[in-house]
Amino acid sequence: MRKLALDDEILLTIEKPARYIGNEVNAVMKDKSEVAVRFAMCFPDVYEIGMSHLGIQILYDMFNQRDDIWCERVYSPWPDMDKVMRDKKIPLFALESQDPVKDFDFLGITIQYEMCYTNILQILDLSGIPLLAEKRTWDDPIVIGGGPCTYNPEPLAQFFDIFYIGEGETVYFQLMDLYKEERAKGSSRMEFLKKAAQIPGLYVPALYEVCYKEDGTIASFTPTDASVPASVEKQIVMDITDTYYSKAPVVPFIKATQDRVVLEIQRGCIRGCRFCQAGMLYRPTRERDVEFLKQKAVEMLDATGHEEISLSSLSSSDYSQLPELVNFLMEECDRRGVNISLPSLRIDAFSLDVMKKVQDIKKSSLTFAPEAGSQRLRDVINKGLTREVILEGAGKAFEGGWNKVKLYFMLGLPTETEDDMKGIAHLCEEIAERYYEIPKDQRNGKCQITASTSFFVPKPFTPFQWAPMCREEEFLDRARIVREEIHAQLNQKSIRYNWHEADVTVLEGILARGDRKVGDAILKAYEHGALFDAWSEYYHPEYWKEAFAECGIDTDFYTIRERSDDEIFPWDFIHIGVTKKFLLREWKRAHEETVTPNCRMQCSGCGAAKYQGGVCVESKS
């Protein structure tokens, strides 16, 4: 009989106890005495967020298909539970077995966003695992990190044994088999790590040394062991139809953020937005076969009982078999009484026709992401979306019965001027005017336009990785300019405006392009009490300011400084296919306000063609 790690007294006093009891529908249970490798798969945020993550669902299913591996799940305890565990000295446990995480062979942590870095330390701390990798022994799990933030792993280097660079379906089993062999041989932990570092895509920070120049930039990044490669190559699955995909995702006991079946239709994006990290990291664009997707949709709906299905992609409209897939899903979902969610669609005639059929027009809103207020700045960022297309799409939507529009913009983009900022208000006004051109008896109530601005953060492996970012007060000044210009518009009552927190954005920028020195501040901030920094109610900027000051870190060095063309970045040792030469060329083209065509229109020579697949070979086949 499985025994819960928490007694009834605790479960009755904490918020949402179902976060911690496991045993959900489709959770995988095994006999731990019959497996060779125990793997704790962690999302370092609250259960509802982590349970929504598709990547963990895929890897959980993939690992558990092997009889010799048992993969279990673990999430960050919410602050109330965190306090109980510390007060009562309860170690962090995995959901399936309820066993302490420290008893596992591996702790795999997916790192999706920078603001969860202190939660990673919480996971290690509550598990009784030394925070610093150099202090761990075979009594501790191998701590491995994956996900988009590992494309600059350096701020977290001292906390991880291994970073997995690339897509999870590639070399994990090779690592598991190596682990079994080395443990059977009685190898030391370091002997295992040295051999792991020879597996393509695996980065062991302890085996590399960084030297700095007097100005704080990197002078060199070199392996300390001759057997270790000088660079780490991203691992990628070229045929994403012939790979793992969950048939029966775990169904949470409580409502998750994404409480639905998720169908990943493709990876990558053909659009070369110069601010977008995902668009560069996941090149080349690869599509799943439509028949495979139809089969998976049916299997997952059967296995979960979910009442909604969503298509996952960076740009769903670019999926070449979208009409066939959507028509199938509409018929299948109508038969089952299931809703369809279609994010990342361009607003064109086909999309509007589909959305009319699958959405309640009175309740739903259409979303555009112009990103910039002027055509000049949209050309700088290579958005590929014109004012005419936006207004035409909004007009068709209004004529179709919609009256709610959401618009997403960024402030602080390279070369941005006051005219660009005010252009956000002017575009909102033009959309409102387009609505009120419709005869009154044909309108669906009052027009509601919501404009949201986030603040620009330069990310590694983008053309804007050389760019300076704004200070906190500069971001807020720009938001005020937009707000005041909106208030000056004729249809201001139809336009709502909100913006992201500027102080959080600056911290994200420091962590995104940080080096190993930043890791000391992460540790210090955690010691001061930083936790759940992505949640505004728990974010304390003073913890971070104190941490940077105590560590002698000048935060301006990581944020407002424009990088020189030849600077060595902390992440330059990672090769993602897309070359630094191409990114620099795009940085120059941005300043020239020159648009680069998308991958289906013309190859831009980014370097991803080396993988010999996906969109890079479409025109040749």
Predicted regions and their residues:
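N-terminal pre-triad scaffold of radical SAM enzymes
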Residues: 41-45, 63, 249-277, 301, ...
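Radical SAM enzyme core and accessory elements
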Residues: 1-29, 33, 39-41, 488-621
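N-terminal [4Fe-4S]-dependent radical SAM core
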Residues: 10-40, 47-48, 205, 211-262, ...
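Conserved SAM/AdoMet-binding glycine-rich loop
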Residues: 41-42, 46, 115, 299-406, ...
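Canonical Radical SAM [4Fe-4S] cluster-binding loop centered on the CxxxCxxC motif
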Residues: 53, 255-291, 602-620
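Flexible loop/turn segments at secondary-structure boundaries
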Residues: 47-50, 79-82, 115-117, 150-153, ...
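A short beta-strand-loop structural module common to alpha/beta enzyme folds
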Residues: 67-80
